[in-house]
């Protein structure tokens, strides 16, 4: 497929929204077709490119997907779990593909996403960075070799504004490790430790969370044994890596049938 794909960005004025708009302007196969903000926003009518600091793109910010239904092919959503479900419902009714980078979905919301994906193409990924997705492959390999005799801990750090913890990326890391070991993450995860906790259970996967400053995103999986320790780490220095991944996902998704996909499939890693 060589035709350009038109995207829409919801939450256009947010940190990620502005980065997505900036990324879209840099792409050869992506066109920004629409940018959406909440009803009543003072930004309605402003050029999306001007808002993002990249110059005019001739796309005025609007407050309704209905107003721009014919202006895009794929919606990109990095908002909140509740908003993402609303946008997904709209996409299903209007036959639009959607790329979801939102994290923090509960079990019921994940079930809703599964159901909607029977109607439209959906990419759901807790992290759209190419590097993170390669890291997940490395985690599976390390777990196969070392997972049954090492203590496994996952440490993640993000900026002070992040609302969910642990991050979706950290949880995905835990899921990959647990699945490789034949365990259920819900049964073996330990989220933080305090007080007299006793000796470490060797079958657990520990999680530690940091929220501070403007950290874009850092994730480390530690495989610790007596005498040596392997650490697999990814550090993001800019949100642009997530935005560029979302553009890649949108282009790929525009040519897919209804279904639920992830970045491993987008990148051909699975």
Curated annotation (Swiss-Prot):
Keywords: Amino-acid biosynthesis, Cytoplasm, Diaminopimelate biosynthesis, Lysine biosynthesis, NAD, NADP, Oxidoreductase. It is an enzyme of class 1 (oxidoreductase). GO terms for cellular component: cytosol. Its EC number is 1.17.1.8. It is found in: Cytoplasm. The keyword Plastid does not apply. NAD(+) binds at residues 11-16, 37, 101-103, 125-128. Its main location: cytoplasm. Catalyzes the conversion of 4-hydroxy-tetrahydrodipicolinate (HTPA) to tetrahydrodipicolinate. This is 4-hydroxy-tetrahydrodipicolinate reductase. The gene is dapB.
